[in-house]
């Protein structure tokens, strides 16, 4: 019998970032209870030796999002990756498909974490106090309409905003972002053109 290969999309991340994100998820599952429906499975409860753990996030009665932690993979592009990564699956019954981090954040935001109420834009236009506030900004992928951006500015300018959780909410996009390859911008002093040869 021939070998059968299975290809999966895995986002390579460093070990410390994965530990920080996992502890943040555990904090919101067990302490703040805002993610109490989420299930954390340890590495010894999984059926694959490369899997370091799983987080099951129910979205509806039949569908769920699963964040799979992998270890012992081939080293990534950078030396600090050290063979750690995550995979994202959307499951409904026996069907499963892989999704990207932005879509995962949107799916999480449709079910969990408070957002603006439907009548909040009308309240802002009328000058009334807005009582709701979005605590999970990474769940909104697009830039948004001009009306929505103006509405957010009105909400930010209010002197009292509803308090969210003290620790940030677990965002899959933040977990998988590539901080190391971003250009660093210096703030403050401009560089001396005579010294840099420009």
Curated annotation (Swiss-Prot):
It comes from the Viruses. It is a peripheral membrane protein. The modification Phosphothreonine is found at residues 97, 145. Residues 152-170 are annotated as: Multimerization. The modification Phosphoserine is found at residue 171. Highly phosphorylated on serine and threonine residues. Thr-97 and Ser-171 are phosphorylated by the mitogen activated kinase MAP4K1. Polyubiquitinated and degraded by the proteasome in the presence of APOBEC3G. A motif (HCCH motif) lies at residues 109-140. It is found in: Host cytoplasm; Host cell membrane; Virion. A motif (BC-box-like motif) lies at residues 145-154. Its main location: host cell. InterPro entries: Vif (IPR000475). One of its GO terms (cellular component) is host cell cytoplasm. Residues 159-198 are annotated as: Disordered. The keyword Electron transport does not apply. Residues 76-115 are annotated as: RNA-binding. GO terms for biological process: viral life cycle. Residues 177-178 are annotated as: Membrane association. Residues 188-198 have a biased composition (Basic and acidic residues). The BC-like-box motif mediates the interaction with elongin BC complex. The HCCH motif (H-x(5)-C-x(18)-C-x(5)-H) mediates the interaction with CUL5. Counteracts the innate antiviral activity of APOBEC3G. Forms a complex with host APOBEC3G thus preventing the entry of this lethally hypermutating enzyme into progeny virions. Functions as an adapter molecule, recruiting APOBEC3G to the ubiquitin-proteasome machinery. Targets APOBEC3G for degradation through the assembly with elongin BC complex, CUL5 and RBX1. Binds viral RNA and affects the stability of viral nucleoprotein core. May play a role in viral morphology. Interacts with host ABCE1, which seems to be involved in lentiviruses capsid formation and displays RNase L inhibitor activity. This is Virion infectivity factor. It comes from Simian immunodeficiency virus (isolate TAN1) (SIV-cpz). The lineage of its organism: Viruses, Riboviria, Pararnavirae, Artverviricota, Revtraviricetes.
